[in-house]
Amino acid sequence: AMILAIVSNHNQTFALTYKKGDVLTTRSTSASGLTGHNGIYIGNGKVLDTPRVHHYPRVMSVKKWIKSYPKTKVTRPKNSSLGNKAANNAVKYFKGKKIPYKVTPNPKNIKKTYCSEIVWYSYYKAGKQYMIPEHGVWLPPSIVAPYAFVNKQDVKHNGFKFVDNKW
């Protein structure tokens, strides 16, 4: 099921159709030294994220996300079944779970978690390791930066595309 949201941003109103697995990245916040913030669209008009102030993963409406974080870009895997699997994993591993917020190395360990790790791990469990370049070599990151999901080179290399590329 797709959701159509009318988003009003900088006096422009545009319609955006969200699909499961869409990665929302905002620059409207920063926490624990990480600039930016991520959420993953899980279907039915809902986004899953974990903000520092809330301490545990939470679910909110896309409408509330856009209101809270007006400067948001959206990326999507070119393979829609991968997006579906990742969204289902976000629900399975994080929705309603009392996993404390903390930025720690190794995104495969989710005893503690943070916003971009939730997105990374959900895709990892769907069979996709989102890689970033380190000294010219593409590797899984030790700490996942929120902006990795909107860096043009990273997005392209990992088989994602921009659905909304405007802050």
Regions found by a protein language model. Give the residues of each.
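Active-site nucleophile-His-acid catalytic modules used for acyl/amide transfer and hydrolysis
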Residues: 74-135
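Intrinsically disordered, low-complexity, charged/polar segments
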Residues: 59-80, 84-88, 142-157, 163-167
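Generic detector of short, well-ordered, non-transmembrane alpha-helical segments enriched
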Residues: 9-11, 35, 86, 115
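Histidine (H) residue identity feature
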Residues: 10, 37, 54-55, 135, ...
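Activation targets extended, charge/polar-rich intrinsically disordered C-terminal tails
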Residues: 110-167
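Sec-dependent N-terminal signal peptides of Gram-positive bacterial secreted proteins and lipoproteins
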Residues: 1-12
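Glycine-rich catalytic cores of cysteine/serine-nucleophile enzymes that process amide/ester linkages
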Residues: 17-77, 100-110
